[in-house]
């Protein structure tokens, strides 16, 4: 039990140091005399509580907001990296997010069968969106890849052949003296 308490306290200290320069949290900390980490944890708890109780349907917009903003941030960061390791994770996320958005067309039926759907959706989306959890990789290897390999075969040759033909035509045009 002490290990979990130590881990939680270390996480709170990490939040305090990570958000040390945030002016809004500094102002709240000065007014309430609470550490920044308590304010952050409290705001996150209220956010999840609003999603959980879904008063006036606010759970849907809050769930979709967090499901869009956090992965968008990671996607913008991934566009600036040279490696493709984060691309698979983010593409998997956006496939799942799109699938859930299409399924939610029948949201009244979903809410009838799954009363806390928006809360579960938010937790699941955070699980697959945050790279350190590795949820997107698990969803990709267990669900998406087997399904797509079986039902959506990708034909590699057609696009490659077309690219080769275009390149050959461009080279022929250059060789014959064509210039812009």
From Swiss-Prot:
Q: How does the annotation summarize its subunit structure? A: Oligomer.
Name the principal localization, coarsely classed.
endoplasmic reticulum
Chain ranges sitting on the Lumenal side read 56-57, 106-108
Statement: the UniProt record of this protein carries the keyword Membrane? yes
Name of the protein this chain belongs to: Protein YOP1
**What membrane topology does this protein have?**
Multi-pass membrane protein
Ranges that cross the membrane? 36-55, 58-78, 89-105, 109-127
Q: What is known of its domains?
A: The short lumenal loops between transmembrane domains 1 and 2 and between transmembrane domains 3 and 4 may impart a wedge-like configuration, thus deforming membranes.
